[in-house]
Amino acid sequence: MLKDFTRKKVLVIGAGRSGLAVSRFLVKKGASVVLADAGKPDYPDGELEDLTAAGVELSLGGYPGVGKESVDLVVVSPGVPLTVEPVRAAVREGIPVTGELELAYYFTRSPIVAVTGTNGKTTTTTLIGEIFKDAGMNTLVGGNIGSPLIAEVERYGPDDVIVAEVSSFQLETASTFRPKVGVVLNITPDHLDRHGTMGNYAATKARMFANQGPGDFAVLNCDDPLAASLKAGVRSRVIFFSRRKELKEGVWVSGGMIVASLNGHREVVCRSDELGLPGAHNLENALAAVAAAKAMGIESNSLAGTLRRFKGVAHRLEFVAEVDGVRYINDSKGTNPDAAIKALESYGEPIVLIAGGKNKGSDFREFARKVKEKAKVLVVLGQSAGLIAEAARAEGFENILYADGFREAVLLARRVARPGDIVLLSPACASWDMFKSFEERGDLFKEIVLSLKKG
């Protein structure tokens, strides 16, 4: 990493939220910045003018050439694959390539609690942040959610704490990143269109711990085989959590109680049925949050209060409204089959499920088995509609409706739902075939449902 960015030539690839934040930050550090994107993203009025006024040169609709004479450093946004030509050219030329997470870490003075995993990252990151805030700590919550870390890290000092949601894409370009506490919630199939194999995907998640030492902590899910297996390569102190079995040390559930035992001191945190979050998967998220909080020295009575008050975050099993006796649940963040399975398992009522979108190389067979077990009707849409319907039929599930668009999907679900049912949006797919983000998808779902409620 460059030690001084004054007059250094930096190419930032990817003009999304992360790329914009990196560009603004490096210009303030005296760098000459070119922000490039293969597409031409839509920005709010005045955004491009503000960037150019700040000194950022824009290259939208294509990438500039990369050579040692024109570029000293390449910063890749997490959404951009490392196989794009400017990155490959930089590697060939020996030009350093990094990402926003690594860059932010370079300027960080605060201890970091970093959370990764296939599912549950945002909920767990937000919960840990609330635990620290309630304990009186000055806390930044960011990374893959909220503000990019690079935009905020210099405002926080050694006595503060940073809680970061970290994706596999961000970890790909992390070389010296060293969180005080690293959390891996689970590793199930996702993003295989980018990582290729589960082995590659797990290895990328393991980069979380590559630079940790004996004074750091690795929080791992004992119930998830791939996550638990990461212990073999960890040099820091491992804290396991489990909702299925009792542990000699770590955080687990015993007799309906959340129990923590670190350094030989066992204590009850709270009852598991006191949690403000629905679903067994959210119990796992809470156990991980307890483990991270205990690693940072938070007292149990303080964190127990937060566990009771915390009601979750938007687009994750978010209750929207009850219309004509039917409850509508927004789980737009259920962007892979495992997340949608966990959503289906969270409810005992009859479910009308809305699923479909852009496939990320997923296998829908296990998801289809859960659909047969839990759903009364499946409404499919988007690029993956046929694949999901085919998988469901292979399991003997025939009550399938096809929707041409998102609004039609919600209206079809409403038509077949009866009082006491749940209409659940948990797509098991990404949103990019129809929306810019899962947030946009979830917001439209809420808008449609609330319009139905108004009549």
UniProtKB/Swiss-Prot annotation:
GO cellular component: a single term: cytoplasm
SUPFAM superfamilies attached to this UniProt entry: MurCD N-terminal domain (SSF51984), MurD-like peptide ligases, catalytic domain (SSF53623), MurD-like peptide ligases, peptide-binding domain (SSF53244)
GO biological process: cell division; cell wall organization; peptidoglycan biosynthetic process; regulation of cell shape
Localisation per UniProt entry: Cytoplasm
InterPro entries: Mur-like_cat_sf, Mur_ligase_C, Mur_ligase_C_dom_sf, Mur_ligase_cen, MurD
Full protein name: UDP-N-acetylmuramoylalanine--D-glutamate ligase
Short name of one Pfam family: Mur_ligase_C
UniProt keywords, alphabetically: ATP-binding, Cell cycle, Cell division, Cell shape, Cell wall biogenesis/degradation, Cytoplasm, Ligase, Nucleotide-binding, Peptidoglycan synthesis
Keyword set includes Cell division: yes
Binding positions (ATP): 117-123
Its job: Cell wall formation. Catalyzes the addition of glutamate to the nucleotide precursor UDP-N-acetylmuramoyl-L-alanine (UMA).
EC number per UniProt: 6.3.2.9
Catalytic reactions of this protein: UDP-N-acetyl-alpha-D-muramoyl-L-alanine + D-glutamate + ATP = UDP-N-acetyl-alpha-D-muramoyl-L-alanyl-D-glutamate + ADP + phosphate + H(+)
Source species, domain of life: Bacteria
Family: Belongs to the MurCDEF family.
Pathway(s) of this molecule: Cell wall biogenesis; peptidoglycan biosynthesis
The organism of origin for this protein: Pelotomaculum thermopropionicum (strain DSM 13744 / JCM 10971 / SI)
GO molecular function: ATP binding; UDP-N-acetylmuramoylalanine-D-glutamate ligase activity
